[in-house]
Amino acid sequence: MSFLHIRKRHRQPLKIITVLFLILTVAGIWYVNHLYRSVFENNVRIPGYEIYLNQSISLQDLADSLEKDQALLDVGAFRRTLKLMKAGDAAVPAGHYKLKEEMSNREMINMFRSGTQAPVQVIVRKARLPEDLAEDIASQMSFSADTFLHLLGDTAFLDSLGLDRHTIMGIFLQDTYEMYWTLSPRDFILRMKKEYDRYWNEERREAAAKKDLTPMEVITLASIVEEETAKEDEKPVVAGLYLNRLRRGWRLQADPTVRFARGDFSSKRVYLRDLEAESEYNTYKIDGLPPGPICIPSKSSIEAVLHAAEHPYMYMCAKPDFSGYHNFARTAAQHERNRQAWIRALRK
């Protein structure tokens, strides 16, 4: 009996050791799995969440921002991964970052630490003045409007591009462009010049030459067409009219150029006193085209000039039905009748 009792007592520590081993094994597996999930599993609550950093910050500070906006499923897991990767004090460069769907903490940290930005879509819209363009572009980029505007007037920089203060607006083409948010103003303009040169391929240059126009002169005429009509089907007709006047050596007498010279775009009405304004943009006073575009025209207006309609019209006047379309005329007498009809409609 005593022998059996001794053997039973010896089994007790073995059971304890076995149980402890199992507990430690399970705990170890759980811990390793927990670490693995912290590092490698998806932790994005808001796919497409965007971060704009004007200056470099630490990953710890960025974690605070992500927590505040509830962008992550488990911010604690993100912080633990920072410790494991010894990246808490790492700097995140200024830039635009975007969280992708199914992104792990490790992927996010590597993205931030390496400064791998997500490009932004920048829209170049119609603008009349450099100030308007600068405000619009700066609202989509990291640089300031003042910095951009200063460069638009930098004579030495413009000279290096073969441009001047009149023609610089002509290289901006209405479109959407993909680029990095932190691009400098200088590189932005160089990108626009590259896009301009790409647009003016051999076919378009030949089409311009057939009309005795340079690419910039096409842009300038297109800007007048852009301001004259919003009707796409009417643009080639308007372009053809102004080309007719140029070929005959007539002054363009385009009201939009008078409004541009006046600097007041609040009203489309042009008064007799406006026609006498001394300005290199007033086509009632100057021969030929103004020295540069009066706005950033759409590509459809540019194409309307390159593929202008052939017709005998020399005059145009807004239709009295206020449809936005115009009546076209070959003679001054016909034009005067159209003009009187428009005046009567205004007085009603």
Predicted features along the sequence, with ranges:
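N-terminal type II signal-anchor transmembrane helix
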Residues: 3-47
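Bacterial extracytoplasmic/cell-wall-associated proteins, especially those involved in peptidoglycan
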Residues: 58, 123, 135, 141-146, ...
